[in-house]
Every structure is written in C-alpha cells, then in structure tokens.
Amino acid sequence: MNDKTLNNTLLDGRNFLDICLNFHNNKKYKLLSPPKATVVIPLYNCEKTISAALHSVQYQNLSEIEIILVNDFSNDNTSKIINNYQKNDHRIKILNNFKNMGTLYSRTIAVLISKGEYIFNLDNDDLYFDKDVLDYIYKRGKNENLDIISFQAIKIWNYTADIINMLNIFTYQYQEEQYVKQPELGTWMIKHKEKFVVHNNMIWDKCIKSSIYIKAINLMGFKRYSKFLSWAEDTSINFVIFNIANNFKHLKKYGIYHFMGINTASFTQPTNSKLFGEIFFLDILFDFSRNNTYDKNLIIGQAIYIYKRYQFYNFINDTNNFSYLKGVLNKLINCKYLSKLNNRKIRKLFTYFYII
C-alpha cells in the first residue's frame, strides 16, 4: 500500500469514525435468519463509549448479523442505553451477568449461543474502521474456507475533536498477506508475536469460524472459562483456538480503531490479577500444547517469565495465587511430557518460593 492509497484509506476511516461518534442512529433493523456473522461485545460501565461502538456495527454494509451484548454487572447507565438500542434493532441480544465475571466468561457465553458462521469480538470502546469491514472479512473467510482471519488495527489514545492527529497505526512487519496452516499454526501465534506486533495475541483483531471457537471453548471447559480473569484472557483462549484450527490468514485490511486509554488493563490491573492471568496461561500451555520441542520451550519460557516477573512478590499474603501456582508447577515437574532437565530447571527456580 503506497502513501497515497494509505492516506485515502485513512481519510475514509476518519469519515466513518466521525459518523459513529457524532450521529445518533434511529434506523430500525430486523434480524435476518440465519445471520452470516455474530458480533460479540462485552460491556462493563461503558456508558460513554458503547453508542459509538454500536454505531460502527449498525452502519456496516453486512446487515445479516446478530449483535450479542453481554452486560457484565455494570452499575452505570450502560443497561439503559443498550435497552434503548434494542428497541430499534432486533438483531441485538442482551445477556446480563449476575455478577462481574470478566471478559473471558462474557465472550464465551455469547459465543455459545451465537448463530453466525463467523464470530467478531469488539471491545466496548472500539469501533470498526469503515462500513465495509465485516462484509469484506466475512467474504474472504467464506470464499477461502478460513478458520481464523486477522486484520490491521489503528490505536486511539483519546476520543477528542482532533482525533485524527492522535492516530497511531499498528504497522505489521509482514508486507503481504500471511497464510499459515497446521501443524505450524499451533505455536505460530506466540512464536511470531514480536514480528507480528504486540497485539497478535488479542481476540479483538480477529474473525473466527464459530464451529472452531465453540470447540475451543468446550475443550477449555466451564471450570476454566468461568474464572474471573482480567489478564492474559485473550492469549489463553487464542492459544487453544490456534491449536485446533486448520488455518489462519492475516489480511492487509484496516479493520478496527482500538482504544488505548490510561484506564486499560495494562495500566490498571493490580499485580495479583496479572499474576493469576500468567499462571492461568501457563496452565493452558501445559494442557493444550503438543509433544514437540517448541511447545515444551513455550511452557518453560512462561514458567521462567513468571519467576523473573514475580520473584519478589509476597506470596505469603496471596494464598490463592500461591496454591494455584503450586498446583500448576507440581503438574509440570511430575509429568513425563517435559524432560528431566526442564523439570530440574523449574524446581531450581521456584525452590526459594517454598512452592515446590
């Protein structure tokens, strides 16, 4: 894409962004059955952003969709806002959590009742880039029989009048479309995370075939996805999905404006929540990796990361994470899957934690 084409693309995206932010939608929509795609949006106290996010979905050229909103026990005006939108848009389904459950659970219960062939996950403060996003990606997935499709993103640091001056493009190092199939696909996502930029492990920049997504959820199991998880939740479910999918394709298509405010998880999550997410991901890596050298290195690498990142953490005052990490580490060192050398490495690292 040359500079002129890129500038025209960004201008089209800016015009669509202005519409989503500044014009209220009173149009009535009917649910067409069966929907071609499902858009899942988890909600928590998002009264300031959910209208624009919904507009970016409603204004899509692909109208044969369902929109599943999961209200994660919000205590602001989120519920009132989405109920008003549902009156005019019969494609909207609303699920209400009985307590704050987190995004992994919220997305999961929506996917399990979805009717679309493909699933798009949208954060409640994100917006689609232009009106052609869903239609273009759905058709590419359908025509090429793709299980996972990822697309380009633009990050926004604030909703402001001069927002166009604050756009920062996620530039992928891949200059062409990328296609990967099994057996390389299982570990490709994490193996290339540096080359493929920091958000490759995220769920919001991907479209996933619903049958694959549901299979991954069932493999993960209710006991796991019902845990309150506010860190590494996307990475964990993505790893399972990538392990069972047949193929993956990255498209050179700008698909989403991703909000990167100071209140996002990377800035606000307490240390114990981040640690729980990292242990959860280590557990997922062990249970869903395959018996090959690279997968073993992923497991050891995650264990070493936890040690280095949390070696001065006070586990005495965090019995939940202490017990969880102890259980996962004991599972690792007592298995035949990892070599004796790796088992000794893990044991040596965590001896001084009095965990193993």
Which residue ranges define each predicted feature?
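Short, acidic, metal-binding catalytic loop of nucleotide-sugar glycosyltransferases
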Residues: 55-64
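Conserved donor NDP-sugar-binding/catalytic core segment of glycosyltransferases
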Residues: 132-171
